[in-house]
Structure formats: structure tokens, C-alpha cells
Regions:
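Helix-to-loop junction immediately C-terminal to a conserved catalytic motif
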Residues: 53
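Conserved ABC ATPase "signature" region
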Residues: 68-69, 116-134
Length: 341
């Protein structure tokens, strides 16, 4: 299985001609953690994924993986680094003329010299991981959209990637199947300890799936950090998007103009209370992810730097044993049950 790697993005900017997509994007994805990238339509989230894997070249900035800057490295080194990535595209991106087995096996046949017997063992393992055992001979046109996404996910995992990218995995799925897919993503992170980055519009996914959340808005990264930071934030953009409200700076186009905001204020738009934070999805088997302990140490190390509401949310998630370990007091109800970190 792959083991996650830290991904450090520094000052990344991308344009198409004179049209700027985003500027000076800087954040770090800790190894093995689940990260979600949100933002209104048209903010360049999918473009960011393509820059991350080297399909598009940014005008400025750096992307560091294993001390290699993907923006400036030589083509042969970039080719090797790309093998560290697995990608689930919006529609699964399966070859319609191939059955699911051959779709999943494709990267192994293209990028390795493994024997067919080895390939079969690996493919069957990955298909079992995503719940597709018995469907190997089916064609993409014979299965549901959710199954196609799972087949695409199996293909993305087949080279044991250190970094797994998900481009709107919930696109086209109903809420129930989105919930099943989110549980699968958590379970796969537990099994692989790979670093996950998920681009999505789904608010429930953003509230329950990630360890860290980032929001792109108005050609910049508005905020990136632990889930507790964003889910308790009163920043107008972050709060509006994560709670799916009409009231706020985000309009039908990316940003409301001054007249719209003034009219909203004159109409007495009230300040909304943040809803209670939803619990993070836990592995189905009741165990923990390897990233949980690392994340807990990391977040507790920065606790004093976070706003009070985020601090309180983190403290409230700790068990009694964890409180004693970190010397924490002043939290809410103490728990010895499932952990969020």
C-alpha cells in the first residue's frame, strides 16, 4: 500500500492568456490526511488539480513533493513523480470498450513490467477494496454511475499512490450514494495512509469527511486549515459557503457587486448563528486511521494559534485520556468513544 507524503504548495499562480484563474495559492497538505478543496463554480479547483499533477504549468510558484519542485523539475523526474499520484476523475474516465478488470489493470500494464498473474492479484485486491468483486467482466455502459466511480477509484489505487486526487467524486450521485462513497473514502484512507485531496461542491462532504478544508474564492485561497478552524469560522465567505446560505458576499456570479450587498444590508440581512459542528466520519470497522494520531499532535501543537471557537471544538473532541495526555482542560463533554483526530 502507498504511504502518504506531504505536499507543499507555495505562491502558485495560474492564468490562461490574460485571464487570471488564481494567484499566490499557498498551503501544505500533511501526509496521510484527508483534505477537501471547496469554492464556487469557476474558481479553478479542477485547474489546480491539473497543475498539481503536472498537466498544466503555473506561471509562478512551487509544488514540493519529496523535496522536488514539480514546477521546475526536468521532464523525466516529473514523469516519475506522477506515478505517485492516483486520480479519480468526475465521470470515472473509464474506457468504454474495456471491461472493468482491464480498465483497472491498464496502469499496471502501461507503467510496470509485472506478470499477468501479478496484475490479476493486484486488480482483484483493489476491486475488492471498492466493493466490485464479481463485476470484473462488466462494461462501463452496463453499470451505474456510482459503480463507475468505484471502478475509477480502483484504477486510481492500483499503483499504490502516495497521493490520491478526487475531482468532484460526488458529481452526479444522489445524497445516499454520496454518503456511501464518503465512507469508502475514509475506509480507503485507513487502509492506505495515502494523502487525499478532494475537490467538491457538496457541503455535507465538506462538513463530515476531511481533516483539513480549503476554500478558493475570488482568485485566491480564502482559507486553509484544520476542519475545526473553518467549520467554526465567522469569515463571511467561509461561513456562507459551508452553510449554503444566499446571504453573504458570494452571489450568482462569483462575487456580489456593491449594489447587491448594500441592498442586502438595507433589507436587514441578519447575522446567522453557526450550526453545531457535525462529527467526522470514522472508519467502518471502528478502528482508527494512522493519520489521526499525527493530526492530533499537529493540531494540539498549534492550538494556541487558533481562534477560541476552533480551540474549543478541538478540545471537545478529545477523550479523557487524550486530555490528560495533552494537559487540556476546559472542554465540553468528556468522551472515551470514537476519536476525530
Amino acid at each position: 500500500m502507498g504511504v502518504g507524503v506531504e505536499v507543499k504548495v507555495e505562491g502558485l499562480s495560474k492564468s490562461f492568456g490574460r485571464a487570471n484563474v488564481w494567484s499566490d495559492v499557498t498551503f501544505t497538505m500533511p501526509r496521510g490526511e484527508i483534505n477537501v478543496l471547496l469554492g464556487p463554480s469557476g474558481t479553478g479547483k479542477s485547474v489546480f488539480l491539473k497543475c498539481l499533477i503536472g498537466l498544466l504549468k503555473p506561471e509562478a510558484g512551487s509544488i514540493f513533493i519529496h523535496d522536488t519542485d514539480l514546477v521546475r523539475t526536468k521532464a523525466d523526474r516529473l514523469y516519475e513523480i506522477r506515478k505517485l499520484f492516483g486520480v479519480l476523475f468526475q465521470d470515472g474516465a473509464l474506457f468504454g470498450s474495456m471491461n472493468l478488470f482491464d480498465n483497472v489493470a491498464f496502469p499496471l500494464r502501461e507503467h510496470t513490467k509485472k506478470k499477468e498473474s501479478e496484475i490479476r492479484d493486484i486488480v482483484m485486491e483493489k476491486m475488492d477494496m471498492v466493493g466490485l468483486t464479481g463485476d470484473e467482466m462488466k462494461l462501463p455502459g452496463e453499470i451505474s454511475g456510482g459503480m463507475r466511480k468505484r471502478a475509477g477509484l480502483a484504477r486510481g489505487l492500483v499503483l499504490d499512490p502516495e497521493i490520491m486526487l478526487f475531482d468532484e467524486p460526488d458529481s452526479g450521485l444522489d445524497p445516499v450514494r454520496t454518503a456511501y462513497l464518503n465512507q469508502l473514502i475514509v475506509d480507503l484512507n485507513q487502509k492506505t495512509d495515502s494523502t487525499f485531496l478532494i475537490v467538491t461542491h457538496d457541503i455535507n462532504t465538506a462538513q463530515t469527511l476531511p481533516d483539513n478544508i480549503g476554500i478558493m474564492y475570488h482568485k485566491h485561497l480564502a482559507m486553509f486549515g484544520p476542519r475545526e478552524l473553518l467549520l467554526t469560522s465567522e469569515d463571511p465567505v467561509v461561513s456562507q459557503f459551508l452553510n449554503g446560505r444566499r446571504e453573504g458576499p458570494i452571489g450568482m456570479s462569483e462575487e456580489k457587486d456593491a449594489d447587491e450587498q448594500a441592498a442586502e444590508q438595507q433589507a436587514g440581512a441578519k447575522k446567522f448563528q453557526l450550526p453545531a459542528m457535525k462529527p467526522q466520519i470514522m472508519p467502518m470497522d471502528g478502528g482508527t486511521r494512522a493519520a489521526e494520531g499525527r493530526r492530533r499532535d499537529r493540531v494540539m501543537g498549534m492550538l494556541h494559534e487558533l481562534p477560541l471557537k476552533a480551540q474549543q471544538a478541538i478540545k471537545d473532541s478529545l477523550t479523557d485520556e487524550q486530555r490528560r495526555q495533552y494537559g487540556v482542560s476546559g472542554g465540553g463533554a468528556h468522551r472515551d468513544g470514537p476519536r476525530q483526530y
